[in-house]
Amino acid sequence: MIYKTGVRILQATVGLESSSRALLIRFPLKIEVPSLLTDFRTVVEIPFSEKLDGRLVLENEPSGRAEYVLSGRKAVFRGPLLRLEKKTSDIRYSLWGNQGFLYRFFLYLLELRHRIFSFHACGLYDEGNHRLFVVAGGAGSGKTVYLLSGIARGLKLFSTETVHFRFERKGLTWFKGSLVDNIRLGTLVRDFPQFCPSEIAGKSKDEIWQKKIALDLAAFESQPDVIVEPRLVLIFPRIEEGRRGFIAGRLEDKRKAAKSVFDNLSQKIAESVVLYDQLPVPGFDDGPLAEARLKASFALVGHKTMEKTTSVLSNPVECWGNLLDD
């Protein structure tokens, strides 16, 4: 028997087929560190259809070898998938983990089918001034520091991890992303105690620096889910504990700014990943897709709404510098 369902994230859709019901993604998703809710605002179950944007086929073969094949917009996994799910060392790098296959497949389909581009970034919205701050960077760059300090300063949450945009007839349009952030408990205790959850009680210093939690920040989200033509500030940070001062370097050269944007937009689509500690999955990127993304990167940095594109070198306390000045 074949079990079928579908998934929608923003406008993109994927049909799932599995030889085992136990392999299918389980709804509703939980708020936890490996959840796709730390990547996207909503992950919605929809009816299966042959006409969806992508297709994912899972064939559990207990005695077989793990294999992955991509043909067009159809991906097939076969092998001892149920056993791999149970024994993997890091469930984030699995079919449904927040660093895994479906996460990257959806980013690919959003670009390919809907021309929706996705920053690896947090987004904060100044509702009074109609200004969107996009803080772009990988793990350890300082996104969480900007996220929590921005909320503490009165900005509204637009996304914790993934910020989406598309050029539309009505103007440059931004789509709300994830509202849950994976944060190390030690960061909360040291820098943002006002956000500490009750579970921190009784934890040792070693424990709080080893453990991450999925912090639901939906209480601070912006009113609009879609923002059209906001004033835009794009920040590429490097935040270091113990560093003094605030150093901002505006990216005046549009070529360098566009490259920084392109590199960030490409990261999760282009990189290869190992699932279940043993199954390599190449990136989805190709020439036409990359060319369209580079064109979008130049269009973004040159757009009339772009107030500044800047790099920042600072510490958690001074990271905003004069960026919030109107």
Where are these regions (language model features)?
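Post-Walker A alpha-helix
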Residues: 146-147
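Conserved glycine(s) of the Walker
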Residues: 141-143
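A noncatalytic interaction/capping subdomain that flanks phosphate/NTP-handling catalytic cores
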Residues: 1-136, 152-153, 164-326
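GT-A fold catalytic core of metal-dependent nucleotide-sugar glycosyltransferases
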Residues: 156-157
